[in-house]
Amino acid sequence: MSESEQRHAHQCVSCGINIAGMSAATFKCPDCGQEISRCSKCRKQSNLYECPDCGFMGP
């Protein structure tokens, strides 16, 4: 994994905050399988997210 990919792996894909050490969910994109991370606040508020690889959007 590149340094850029590692940075993105520890950021909420919805709001961009650093999620290291926080309650967060990490899951695979339903379309392409890319790992996506979201903070608990964005999950609770059902904020939209977009997969950085394929553009899939979900709640």
UniProtKB/Swiss-Prot annotation:
A GO molecular function assigned to this protein is: zinc ion binding
Residue ranges annotated as motif C(P)XCG motif 1: 12-16
Q: Does the keyword Zinc-finger apply?
A: yes
Q: Which InterPro entries match?
A: HVO_2753-like (IPR044720), HVO_2753-like_euryarch (IPR049683), HVO_2753-like_ZBP (IPR011668)
Motif C(P)XCG motif 4, residue numbers? 51-55
Q: What is known of its domains?
A: Contains four C(P)XCG motifs, suggesting the presence of two zinc binding pockets (ZBPs), but only ZBP2 (comprised of C(P)XCG motifs 2 and 4) is occupied by zinc. All four C(P)XCG motifs are essential for protein stability, folding, and functionality.
- Asked if the record carries the keyword Acyltransferase, the reply is no
Q: Where is this motif: C(P)XCG motif 2?
A: 29-33
Quaternary structure, per UniProt, is: Monomer in solution.
Outcome of altering residue 29 to A?
A: Not able to complement the deletion mutant of this gene. Loss of swarming. Severe loss of structure and stability
Question: Which key words tag this protein in UniProt?
Answer: Metal-binding, Zinc, Zinc-finger
Q: What happens when the gene is disrupted?
A: Cells lacking this gene grow as the wild-type in complex medium and in synthetic medium with glucose as sole carbon and energy source, but the mutant cells are not capable of swarming and have severe defects in forming biofilms. In this mutant many motility and chemotaxis genes are down-regulated, and several genes likely involved in sugar import, sugar metabolism and glycoprotein production are up-regulated.
**Top-rank lineage group of the source organism:** Archaea
Job description of the protein? Zinc-binding protein that binds only one zinc ion. Is required for swarming and biofilm formation.
* Protein name (record): Zinc finger protein HVO_2753
Task: Give the GO biological process terms.
Answer: archaeal-type flagellum-dependent cell motility; single-species surface biofilm formation
Positions bound to Zn(2+): 29, 32, 51, 54
Q: Which residue numbers does the motif C(P)XCG motif 3 cover?
A: 39-43
